[in-house]
């Protein structure tokens, strides 16, 4: 971070660590207090339409003393009350306090791009962007939340809000405001919901019509995310999604666009990088491109740092990749655009076609996505943690909620509003912010997400998935990148646990702390340790790494 600040008044205290991206002057310092309006704010994120909102507010007579987005939030709250959030385009977590009433308002953006954790404590409430910050002063219940444990081990490590693995720490759900009264009473309300309803005009549009409409929406989303007082770069994996973003940034006129790609050592014949495809795109658009190669030894040496940086345990193998990539990128860039969200929003995953016309979409979704069924979960954890099958109940409730009738769209909605929030987006925000790097995700522009929800599912499933997005991409990026086999962010050393990582996992699971916590059955752990590569989840993750990482994270942050 570039600077920090603290403000205390009566029973309330506020702290902030600032990354200077919009308005680099001291005028935009936080906590920001406006004595004239009797309001103060701490805010993490970026409001891309702040110039337009500023002009509206100036027309109402508001005077500004800074040029960034933070002050716009304060004035907007004063002008429009809590409904001001519906006018925001961006990613945000904020706390606004009213001097005279003593009331506090917490808010989190629609797609949960920015985190907001809170912990009720004796006589008060703590909140923070980082979960470990809540634990630093003690007094927080760090026992395990049984429902969260079931989610973590069953639902591909997705722990939906308000749960975290710690019983005393909650997270504000995306698209939610929490009002806190001076006497401590709390109330929440949702200000956004994703709806897959479409009118007759939407139904009648052709694939080609949707391609053009989508391309316009993509252009707007990428252009909005160029609003900054520092250069904006891009993470370029070599896949369709990040390549399309680079193409759109180049089309928007970004000069000397910096792009970055990370790769790892091959393991057991499995390729650890996709440099060749990123190079094709970098050459096509003349970017200032950097290949970042991480030797296996560095990966293993730096893994403890990545675990320490995690707000919650994140089992995806690419977490360490994003951590090391972010460190390298932060030497040259403060802001990057990144391609998370396209698979969830536009239907790129392999389970969506299986759901088309499904008679039992809940069962079919769980069969494809779940790491363990309930019987295996009962065999994994000790009896005191058995409880209910929280993840299956959660999926069923989500699929039965109004707003999505088609089985594919039920899955798209759940993946966009929950899985995406709690896995790829959380991972990227957490690991980039560890190095003061801001990642902006144009595929999660809420207007683009709403547009995508109107596109009929069969257009998304076309051409092997993401059909309408791929067709839009053909107008900008090379076919070789679009027609390649689907890739991912490969870190083979974590998929096939062996050597030092296996020993670290073994140590974590056999430690005194693990025995005292008593989460896992010894016979189950021994079975996994005997042959780690034989126990892989349907989504190709290591079951042993899930257990080991959870214990490692708890030992790092809780003890």
Please tell me what each predicted stretch does.
Residues 304-308, 351-354, 496-498:
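Short low-complexity, flexible loop/linker segments enriched in glycine and/or proline
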Residues 346-369:
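A mobile, often basic/glycine-rich helix-loop segment
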Residues 236, 339, 420:
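Conserved S/T- and glycine-rich ATP-binding loop of Class I adenylate-forming
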Residues 328-330:
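Active-site nucleotide-sugar/metal-binding loop of Leloir-type enzymes
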Residues 333-343, 347-349:
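Short acidic/histidine-rich active-site segments
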Residues 10-11, 135-136, 141, 167-173, ...:
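Adenosyl-5′-phosphate
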Residues 1-310, 322, 474-475, 480, ...:
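Cysteine-centered catalytic environments shared across enzyme families
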